[in-house]
Each structure stands twice: as C-alpha cells, then as structure tokens.
Amino acid sequence: MQPDLHCRTLAAHTLKHFRALSPLTHCMTNDVVQTFTANTLLALGASPAMVIDPVEARPFAAIANALLVNVGTLTASRADAMRAAVESAYDAKTPWTLDPVAVGALEFRRRFCLDLLSLRPAAIRGNASEILALSGMALGGRGVDTTEAALAALPAAQALAHQIDCIVVVTREIDYVTNGQRTLSIPGGDPLMTRIVGTGCALSAVVAASCALPGAALDNVASACCWMKLAGQAAAERSEGPGSFIPAFLDALYHLDVEAANEEN
C-alpha cells in the first residue's frame, strides 16, 4: 500500500478550524518537555492543560477536548494517573493519543502501553523503533532515538492501525500517517528539529489536539504533522542553531500560513 502525499490545501483549511475551536488539550506528558509542549499548543491556537495528579486527572480528562499520554518519564504513580485519565476519556468519548516513548527499550512502559491499547486510542505517534516495538514486530531502540527508517515501520504501523482501529503516525524525515487502509506521507521539516528536546513530544500533543476536530481523523492528524514540518522549515531559515531555533519555531507556529507556504513551494 503506497502512501499518498498529504494535501497542503487541506492542511490550511484544517488549521483554520483548529484555531477557531482552540481545543482544550489535557497533556499528561514527560517532565522534560512540559513547557515546550504547552507553548507549542498555545502558539498554534490550542489550550493546553498539564493536569497530572490522579485525583484531578480522572475528572479533567472527561471535560477536555483531547488527552495526550506520553510515557517519557513514566513512574508507578504517574502510570496510575494516566490510566485513570484514559479510562475517564474512554467513558466520555474524549479522543486520546498515546506517545509510547522508548517503549521497545524498557519493559515497564512496554507493558503499560500495551495494556492501554484496550482502551482504544484515537491516535498513536512514535518513531519507527517505537511503532515496531508496540506492534510486536521488533524490540529495541535506544530510548527516544530511532534506529529504523520510518518507511521500514510502515507495515507495522498499518497493521497496528487496523488492529486498534486508530490513526498511527510514524515520524522521521518523512512522516507517515495511516488508518490501516489509507496512508499519507508528509515530507519537510529540518534536521534542526532533531537537535532540540521535545519536537516529537510536542507533535504528539498537536496530534492529540487535532483529534478533537470534526471530520476525517486521518486528514486532521496528517495536517497536524504538516503544520509542524512547515514551522520547522521556516524556523530553520531564521535561526543559527538550536538555541535560536526554539523561539523561531514558536514564532513560526504562531504566524503559520499554510496557504502562503503552499504558494511559495
């Protein structure tokens, strides 16, 4: 099944709806990327909330528009809070997204993520090694860094999407977004995006927020990937290295005009 190139015109249309809705996105993410993730969502027009306590996470997940579960700094107590939030989101029909950080390298998080799959995530976003591990096709990887090309993990992503009935995103130089039947490719971005901490985790939050939009989930999630790629390209042109890239990236998200970028390319 060959992937189709995602349409930027659709990404522009989706961004207008995203900014109008400003989805309240409950981010249960890792300690390293909290601020960057929140700022990424704010710059694009969403409303982030970083609620992590088990007592608060369960009721909040039910009133949010979307939920992100990122296991980057997973602990036993945090796992309890995440499970409570996911169960609440599932009952409330709130779409939730899983970011299975380093799932192939560590057994505790692998078992936790596999257990959560029964609660039907709307989307899963990971690198090739993480998607291969979650699908059961391979274990390994070195933490958040992938040892596989995204294309190599595409069959695993398609099988996982079909099995769980969700959207699966495999990210690297080219992102692949699949629902198991149809697959979209999103090229772009810049190598500087891999030289700062948190762009993948922030993308997962944007993917989660996009799942709150009406319409086809596959197209909405692919649009989220497109926005981040375009902002990365624009930021790289205005920065001299990782230190100046971060503020340039947030500015690029804030000023993102997909239609103008489409005309330039």
UniProtKB/Swiss-Prot annotation:
Any single GO BP term: thiamine diphosphate biosynthetic process
GO terms, molecular function: ATP binding; hydroxyethylthiazole kinase activity; magnesium ion binding
InterPro entries: Hyethyz_kinase, Ribokinase-like
EC number: 2.7.1.50
Taxonomy, superkingdom: Bacteria
Involved pathway(s): Cofactor biosynthesis; thiamine diphosphate biosynthesis; 4-methyl-5-(2-phosphoethyl)-thiazole from 5-(2-hydroxyethyl)-4-methylthiazole: step 1/1
Enzyme class of the recorded protein, top EC level: transferase
Keyword match rRNA-binding: no
SUPFAM superfamilies: Ribokinase-like
Cofactor(s) for this UniProt protein: Mg(2+)
UniProt binding sites for ATP: R125, T171
Keywords: ATP-binding, Kinase, Magnesium, Metal-binding, Nucleotide-binding, Thiamine biosynthesis, Transferase
UniProt: substrate binding residues: M50, G198
Reaction equation(s) it catalyzes: 5-(2-hydroxyethyl)-4-methylthiazole + ATP = 4-methyl-5-(2-phosphooxyethyl)-thiazole + ADP + H(+)
Protein family membership: Belongs to the Thz kinase family.
Biological role stated in the UniProt entry: Catalyzes the phosphorylation of the hydroxyl group of 4-methyl-5-beta-hydroxyethylthiazole (THZ).
Protein name (Swiss-Prot/TrEMBL): Hydroxyethylthiazole kinase
